[in-house]
């Protein structure tokens, strides 16, 4: 017992040194960048270049620090109120692919978690089909002949997360004490929320529930496939799903060789997102190309349900009115709707928000539509949120990021893809169901 406690404390001390060293180097780097810009550089383009360079360095450091900080970086990419737009752009590219751990450990963890149910596995592939910061995925065949995949959590991950998140709390306390660094943000509360989210992500029972709920939403959709959870083979550290074979959506050559209709596939994904956001209020928050594939039948497959988002009932009920206000380009009405839905806190000066919304509506609704309109609007929103002392709900940021990410996927499939023009017929049907004139669109 004494040795294990000593080992834990020594490990925590070593991690603490590495993490604080990284923070110190970051602060020195930011001070140096500000000094260079203030006295030697004149243009905003040069400042942006410096920010991008520092953001790339920070992203690499997060990867070096390991699983917990990779996940922290991904969470920061959804917080435009905390970091500038140039940093968000870099952090959204943060990949958490890491070398796989040994197959011996994989079988050991599955045995420990499944107990006697382990005997239901007929064959378990030794080579993973995917390896990330939290887990790796192995294909398997059960005794009943069903093909499945096992998502297996990395060894000792909870212990490592506890150490790193404890240190992150200390850092948040220091930032909170310094007015120049805190920028009016409650870093201690942010660190606590971050801890809550990450520890929840380590519980694969939560992901199993998310996957089951998401699958239920699309059971009757002939264009969408979602893997089924194998409940008696899933635990806190092991998630078992049916294996859905498909061609990764980024493999355009193979998709074309199979004569798939890429334009239709892009539209199917776009409409699925409208259904997720408007009909169900529960959406896949990370639709990057690695999480999407096309089945042999040409159906869109979603993978990985660790990062999902919710839309409140209050917001869902107001979507029809918001669409009406947006269609009429009535920025004041739309901002009022956002306030009533609880998306903008009371007491906030809505003047800057109203001006930005007016510009966003003009850009979004005036033909010809920009092919990357969501990405452009997200950038405008992020700049406003960073510069003003208010915080948009994280799930709303996840919505913008998910739509922006899928917009990129759509353009990859079809260069003429435009999210606004595709969704217009769907929005017209919503307005009609809310007794509003679709002619306004």
What do these predicted regions represent?
Residues 1-136, 159-187, 195, 410, ...:
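N-terminal accessory/targeting segments that precede structured cores
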Residues 134, 146, 236-237:
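Residues on conserved beta-strands of the protein kinase catalytic domain
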Residues 139, 146-153:
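Glycine-rich ATP phosphate-binding loop
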Residues 290-294:
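Hydrophobic residue at the +6 position relative to the catalytic HRD Asp in the kinase catalytic loop
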Residues 85, 92-99, 111, 158-163, ...:
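ATP-dependent phospho-/nucleotidyl transfer catalytic cores
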Residues 128-132, 230-234, 397:
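A short beta-turn/loop motif at secondary-structure boundaries
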Residues 140-141, 287:
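Conserved beta3 strand of the Hanks-type protein kinase catalytic N-lobe
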Residues 6, 46, 52, 235, ...:
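Helix-rich C-lobe and terminal helical cap/extension of kinase-like folds
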